[in-house]
Amino acid sequence: MHVKQGDTVKILTGKDKGKIGEITKIIKGSNQVVVQDINVKKKHVKPRKEGEIGKILQFEAPIHSSNVMVYNAESQVASRVNYQKDESGKKIRVFKKLLNTN
């Protein structure tokens, strides 16, 4: 998957298009991500026991990973990610849009 937990991402499609948030959870089986304060849904819960009251719960629903793009806050640009090796041979992630700006 092209995104990791903790990445800052920009939403590309849907009702939250253009918003920026941080990934809090990744669901690998369905290639979905949960982004903080994005795609917030409400669930109405009926009371289960005697004397308990009903509730309206708010939660962040998952979004498909193809609908988000990694966002660079420093240059304020969303870009795809390229992988390169540094001098020690460790893989690092580099923004493709920032590679051609030398």
Curated annotation (Swiss-Prot):
It comes from the Eukaryota. SUPFAM superfamilies: Translation proteins SH3-like domain (SSF50104). One of its GO terms (cellular component) is chloroplast. It is found in: Plastid, Chloroplast. GO terms for molecular function: rRNA binding; structural constituent of ribosome. InterPro entries: KOW (IPR005824), Rib_uL2_dom2 (IPR014722), Ribosomal_uL24 (IPR003256), Ribosomal_uL24_CS (IPR005825), Ribosomal_uL24_KOW (IPR041988), Translation_prot_SH3-like_sf (IPR008991). Pfam families: KOW (PF00467), ribosomal_L24 (PF17136). GO terms for biological process: translation. Keywords: Chloroplast, Plastid, Ribonucleoprotein, Ribosomal protein, RNA-binding, rRNA-binding. The keyword Ligase does not apply. The keyword RNA-binding applies. Belongs to the universal ribosomal protein uL24 family. Part of the 50S ribosomal subunit. One of two assembly initiator proteins, it binds directly to the 5'-end of the 23S rRNA, where it nucleates assembly of the 50S subunit. This is Large ribosomal subunit protein uL24c. It comes from Rhodomonas salina (Cryptomonas salina).
